Amino acid sequence: MTTPRDNLAILAETDPVVYRLIQQELNRQRDHLEMIASENFTSPAVLAAQGSVLTNKYAEGLPGKRYYGGCEFIDEIEQLAIDRAKQLFGAAHANVQPHSGAQANFAVFLALLQPGDTIMGMDLAHGGHLTHGSPVNVSGKWFRVVHYGVDPQTERIDFDQVRDLARQHRPKLIICGYSAYPRIIDFAAFRAIADEVGAYLMADIAHIAGLVATGHHPNPVPICDVVTTTTHKTLRGPRGGLILTRDPELGKKLDKAVFPGSQGGPLEHVIAGKAVAFGEALQPSFAQYSAQVIANAQALAATLQRRGIRLVSGGTDNHLVLLDLRSVSAVLEKNGAADPVMTGKRADRLMEEIHITANKNTIPFDPQPPSVASGLRLGSPALTTRGLGPAEFEEIGEIIADCLFQPGDPGVLEACRRRVAELCRRFPLYPHLG
């Protein structure tokens, strides 16, 4: 059996241009601190499954009900992924075929809604997601969208607003689950509101699935009608999507919405990677990993706060930290900086200069447009996979604060780069790839 390293050697010989670019990306991942909250590093076993001969096989349909022959082993692999997903999340039904979280969400809409129906989701600027009704997404074009947000004082979900909007607009579907919300989600509170107005309730747990699977965040599967997620992020699997439900009859509708409703042939090499990742997540070591993800994020948050950087909602309960950079601007202005305005766009570029990968992000009631933003989103999953602990995340917090508070000092930026390089050296990534 060939290994990922063998495959790269073959690629180097047959297509050196692609090989060189892959090696450059590998080096970038090794030499930078990956802090994008939606990214992680899959295991070598997941990489091996994705790079297997399963990529050759078409398998439209479901296990035991295919439209192509030669699927006997494909069926076993996909059924294994289904069974492991059900066990991991306590679901009665799982569909492992969605190519992405966005595809999973679209399949739910196709199964439950008609064009023109009303949906409710969190405002993108408050931590929602494009697929929850943004006007640039199909969800915002096909459906009537009502957005809820967070309380201006606490920056936590405003359930009074959610209830009032639900009573006023009577949505067919309420969506909970977010892309930039650092707090525990009260699924039971959403269930009560959905039941009152006769709405379906969908949880999108793409960001927190790994934490849910290990009990470090409440599980929406017993509460919500349907749950969607990606399989990477905190779940640490391949890039892909997953749909879960406690209702087998609803599961049949969801299956049809995936195929033939919105997709053709499933990506069975990716599904094999999902099966491997779900198996890894069922191990005790993964629960330890999830606990460390939260501890590391909280260590980072405490350091940033100690340095005078304000965090949205005042901290974090999960894997992500959202910085309100207006607090940095205030310090820069007080210190007489030539350019005192620190935006998400500027902070993103500064992070790149010191080899930290992050992303600008809107914050609740943001005065800046999304292309500029007033926030910086940081996450702990990838570096936790790499082996960093709270002490290292405290060091990273100091590095980030030094960079943000002294953005015009080349000496400070160079010192930050050296500190980042030392952390990368101490915690190597994918050494088996050479």
UniProtKB/Swiss-Prot annotation:
Catalytic EC class: transferase
Record GO biological process: glycine biosynthetic process from serine; tetrahydrofolate interconversion
Leader peptide range in chain numbering: none
Keyword Glycoprotein appears in the UniProt entry: no
Recorded GO CC terms: cytosol
Pathway info: One-carbon metabolism; tetrahydrofolate interconversion; Amino-acid biosynthesis; glycine biosynthesis; glycine from L-serine: step 1/1
Top-level division of the source organism's lineage: Bacteria
Record site feature (Plays an important role in substrate specificity), residues: H232
Positions annotated to bind (6S)-5,6,7,8-tetrahydrofolate: L124, G128, H129, L130, E249
Alphabetized Gene3D superfamilies for the sequence: Aspartate Aminotransferase, domain 1 (3.90.1150.10), Type I PLP-dependent aspartate aminotransferase-like (Major domain) (3.40.640.10)
Known EC number: 2.1.2.1
Pfam family, one: SHMT
InterPro entries: PyrdxlP-dep_Trfase, PyrdxlP-dep_Trfase_major, PyrdxlP-dep_Trfase_small, Ser_HO-MeTrfase, Ser_HO-MeTrfase-like, Ser_HO-MeTrfase_PLP_BS, SHMT-like_dom
Localization terms from the record: Cytoplasm
Keywords of this entry: Amino-acid biosynthesis, Cytoplasm, One-carbon metabolism, Pyridoxal phosphate, Transferase
Cofactor(s) for this UniProt protein: pyridoxal 5'-phosphate
GO MF annotation: an example: pyridoxal phosphate binding
Chain positions found as N6-(pyridoxal phosphate)lysine: K233
HAMAP family attached to this UniProt entry: SHMT (MF_00051)
Oligomeric form and interacting partners: Homodimer.
Annotated family: Belongs to the SHMT family.
The protein's name: Serine hydroxymethyltransferase
